[in-house]
Amino acid sequence: MNIRPLRDRIIVERIEEETTTAGGLIIPDSAKEKPQQGIVKAVGKGKVLEDGTVLPMDIKVGDRVLFGKYAGSEIKIDGLEYQIMREDDILGVLE
């Protein structure tokens, strides 16, 4: 990936959800919602505070994260789709 996010921004690759339910029903594309979790692919240096100090990021590359349905912006890099969002948009890290 040839992009480095600035400040407190994070690039996330969405994790696609299952297309079949536990009961074996196939979910059509028209009924699917965008997944709200993904893998962190790149992180910025951190948030710059008013006094000029940089608050380091709690999130690191490789973390599996949860985020809101409308968080961030969709971008396309090298033909792949990603979300770019601020660290504040991340709701939690799955461990």
From Swiss-Prot:
The keyword Chaperone applies. Belongs to the GroES chaperonin family. It comes from Syntrophotalea carbinolica (strain DSM 2380 / NBRC 103641 / GraBd1) (Pelobacter carbinolicus). CDD domains: cpn10. It is found in: Cytoplasm. NCBIfam families: PRK00364.1-2, PRK00364.2-2, PRK00364.2-4, PRK00364.2-5. One of its GO terms (cellular component) is cytoplasm. Pfam families: Cpn10. InterPro entries: Chaperonin_GroES, Chaperonin_GroES_sf, Chaprnonin_Cpn10_CS, GroES-like_sf. It comes from the Bacteria. This is Co-chaperonin GroES. SMART domains: Cpn10. Heptamer of 7 subunits arranged in a ring. Interacts with the chaperonin GroEL. Keywords: Chaperone, Cytoplasm. Its main location: cytoplasm. Together with the chaperonin GroEL, plays an essential role in assisting protein folding. The GroEL-GroES system forms a nano-cage that allows encapsulation of the non-native substrate proteins and provides a physical environment optimized to promote and accelerate protein folding. GroES binds to the apical surface of the GroEL ring, thereby capping the opening of the GroEL channel. One of its GO terms (molecular function) is ATP binding. One of its GO terms (biological process) is chaperone cofactor-dependent protein refolding.
